């Protein structure tokens, strides 16, 4: 089964004889057997027929909607599990301060370990990033003694600044950037990682919702109307090893160029349709590539699913130690 990404404006999706028909300006360009698709991701400006939406709901094919900028808008799905007991336990525990602190420690320490790994791989390019690595290591140690989620996130914020400074020193000069910028991204690197984070966010959101979790009740990120806070929690430790490493690969291989971006008068920078196509292709490859996750070889997609299973075990047993983090080497 595969995810179907539609990134181009003016494209229409329809359903006929159990096949998805993709057309533009009235002319069919492609058809795909619907049984080969388990998720459809469409960007702003794409039309989708009501019969395809109905079929998707009835057959548990999720449809995700993204803005042209890559911002996640929402999803349509059917057949989600009725797991009221798990949801009650989730809401109860995500309101428990001790649980919130211990889960946040586990995830953010894993996130920092993965950031250190990414920087160590690039240390030979610029030895000066040793100081960035050392500071992140200190923040990781400090987190162990934190008494609140806010304190943990303060250390995470310092680490993020050091991490992105280190990345900027070691990538192609054309893509160098001055820190993390979002809503809107202000340079090509930030445009790419913002889009990559959205693609990963929708992937994790689909997995978590399909397993019956209430995606709006998180333990680390604060509740916001309409925002799946739990997914913002889950994604943290995976950002660097899935998204950032993918973007660095694209830059290193010179697969993307300035012409693949839109530079706007307000200073914002976004991928254009060709740029989105390139990023989607490489993110799909990454998610289908293998990782060693707790002694077993599996794809990143499978690891994401296994990790969410481990979170469900945490809820069932009220035991944070059962959560399997994503540390890589």
Where are the regions a protein language model picked out?
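Globin-like tetrapyrrole-binding proteins
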Residues: 56
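Short gly/pro/ser/thr-enriched loop/turn and capping motifs at secondary-structure boundaries
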Residues: 49, 70-75
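Extracellular/luminal Protease-associated
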Residues: 34-48
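Active-site helix-to-loop segments that bind/position phosphate- or nucleotide-bearing substrates
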Residues: 1-16, 25, 31, 73, ...
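Short hydrophobic alpha-helical runs that function as membrane-insertion/retention elements
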Residues: 40-43, 61-67
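Hydrophobic residues embedded in beta-strands of well-ordered beta-sheets
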Residues: 20-21
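Short low-complexity, flexible loop/linker segments enriched in glycine and/or proline
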Residues: 78-81
